[in-house]
């Protein structure tokens, strides 16, 4: 079932992307030879208005094949016969349509589920945050210099960056008035493995912290702890009791991890970690909003995923993420399947919302990735077209073709590497 759902989600996202290229090509008088969904041999095909419309065997990818797109053809109706700005609009339309699709899906989710206001749910009385004036019900609008619109903006900051320093600066709104505060949070250093697990039931790992001992040992969210230092663990309460009785002291810890029904043993050495307590708890739950709010927060939803994708890419370039952390279609399908299984317990509406949520994430992600200035991607083609617009002369087509081919080969090698990692993690 999860493969079918993932295929539908991927197909809709790719169809939207290729539809953008298709509509702008038609608008600019460029002949579209074939518009297809999927890859491989054709299952269904029909020709209308000089364009062949095809459904292909493998529901991954798609294409909008335009006349003269990859050669020197400058005859009437060919891609190269169109003006440079017409070609720029055609190439850019794919990613733009991905953002539009993400916005449409975000409107559905926000209409049904609402948005997550960045409200303060609780402030520890007597903490530095309390002494600085922060109270329950305040709405955070800025945190450590980052603009905050929804609760997940705060959540994203905490996940990607954490609190690196005890000094916290934030802006909150109360009764329509904004107030800036700065306080020095409480902190303590202790040995930690770097993970969060479910508070009840099976001790399933919910999150593995970046650059932690657990991440380096290969532990993943979704793994279940069955043993710790040879002691059997039946539930989260038992794991919690063990850790209270045997505080981590820097000695190596052996864990029995269950993944997809298979048990494996890993070793991880706790690291001395400074824990900074902000002194307050913020909201990540959704609440209803009015029509204008739906529009505003739907745009915010798309902006959130675009900025999160860009920030994650920047961290990858800086070495804060490893290429081993990347997931391809196989890994995404697996995680989507887990989301589906969790959501179906709450009914069809929640399943629909969860899959739309994934569609927003993936559509925004695809839009950003395609705009990267990498040969063979839309962004790489846009670079050549913008240079042509400035020079008022096209670059050597053979050189451009070789650059895009080299980029395509490198992307395929990266895809093989990522898929290998996906299968290794299953």
Short names for language-model regions:
Residues 69-70, 77, 82, 121-187, ...:
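Juxtamembrane extramembrane loops of integral membrane proteins
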Residues 2-75, 369-391:
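Small-residue-rich helix-interface/hinge motifs
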Residues 10-14, 65, 98, 102, ...:
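Alpha-helical transmembrane segments of multi-pass membrane proteins
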Residues 416-426:
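Juxtamembrane boundary at the C-terminal end of a transmembrane helix
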Residues 78, 82-85, 192-216, 221-227, ...:
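Functional transmembrane alpha-helices
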Residues 103, 109-142, 146-149, 188-227, ...:
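PDZ/PDZ-like domain segments forming the peptide/carboxylate-binding groove
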Residues 17, 55, 94, 129, ...:
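Terminal peptide-recognition signature
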Residues 58-125, 406:
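Internal alpha-helical transmembrane segments
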